[in-house]
Regions:
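N-terminal membrane-sensor/transducer module of prokaryotic signaling receptors
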Residues: 2, 10-154
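Localized chelating/binding microdomains
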Residues: 7
Length: 154
């Protein structure tokens, strides 16, 4: 009985090694709505724990705060200065418009509220591209900052 169990275990291990890679699930190329919401929730928790450390992690893309085309952005809730963003750090959020002219930054600055997650839709190119695509960002106010994470539709 013990020998038969050992044989089955060895046989299963060999089969697992021989499985073609294409049968295994691949990570999607782009982030999803659910992943964007989850990243924002983790970002809020990190900000509540230590906002200085959290902002540094967001900027460096550490701690799982940059994944494919998902990233955290944060702006000072008073003056709108982006303190965390992969390439717009130091810009004023209220001045940022989508590629079709929508004032998404102004909306985020005016409507962000502590404890409430809101959504804005605009057109923005994926990192590394010039082609604008429909993008949705979830955002909230936390520890004196308006923070968000966006994902692309389609």
């Amino acid at each position: 009985m013990l020998q038969q169990r050992a044989f089955v275990i060895r046989y299963a291990a060999v089969l697992a090694l021989l499985l073609p890679v294409s049968v295994l699930p691949a990570q999607a190329t782009y982030g999803t709505e659910a992943q964007a919401k989850a990243m924002l929730n983790r970002a809020v928790a990190a900000m509540k724990q230590d906002k200085t450390k959290a902002l540094a992690m967001f900027n460096k893309g550490e701690g799982g705060f940059r994944d494919r085309d998902l990233y955290v952005f944060c702006a000072n809730a008073v003056d709108g200065t982006l303190t965390a963003h992969p390439y717009l750090k130091g810009e004023h959020l209220q001045d940022i418009k989508g590629k079709k002219g929508y004032p998404l930054g102004r909306e985020i600055m005016q409507k962000a509220a502590t404890g409430k997650i809101k959504e804005v839709t605009y057109w923005w190119p994926r990192p590394g591209s010039d082609k604008p695509l429909e993008k949705h960002a979830f955002y909230t106010k936390v520890e004196g900052f308006n923070c968000g994470v966006g994902y692309y539709k389609g």
